[in-house]
Amino acid sequence: MKYNKKFMLEAIRVANENIQNQGGPFGAVIVKDGEIIAASGNSVTTDNDPTAHAEVNTIRKACKKLGTFNLEGCEIYSSCEPCPMCLSAIYWAHIDKLYYATTKDDAASIGFDDSFIYHELTLQPHQRRVHAEQHDRDIALEPFNIWRDKTDKTEY
């Protein structure tokens, strides 16, 4: 896998087009074996879905198209450095390589500042802005134990 400018230009084209369709200024494409498998822009406001970032939307499309949740062998080209949520999704999807154009600082300069999330992740759950409390661990371990012992599970 080697960087190919034509795929980045497509991600940027999707970002530009997305702005015209009431979306945010972000686009992404997923490539496998030199072919675009999926492309999408950010649709947070049009879908009323705060998780509908370009990378997540593109991962969802690629998984549906390929019929798998595992995107090993794929690359993702993003018009911007992914936010923490999208970066996590890239890892969970097992994408092999990430290429991005603009940086998280570039995004922050136009109002998309994720630095507070990076900071929040360094804090203990009870110190975060969204205060978290743990309850009923003993009861909630039951499904974990069932999963651990399940012999016909599909691991991911």
Task: For the regions a language model picked out, list residue spans one by one.
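Short, basic and Ser/Thr-rich N-terminal targeting/leader segments
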Residues: Q22-F26, E72
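Short beta-strand scaffold segments in enzyme catalytic cores
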Residues: F26-G34
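Short secondary-structure boundary/capping segments
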Residues: A28, G67-T68, T122-Q124
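Short beta->alpha transition motifs characteristic of CBS
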Residues: I37-V44
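Helix-adjacent hinge/juxtasegments
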Residues: A52, V56-A93
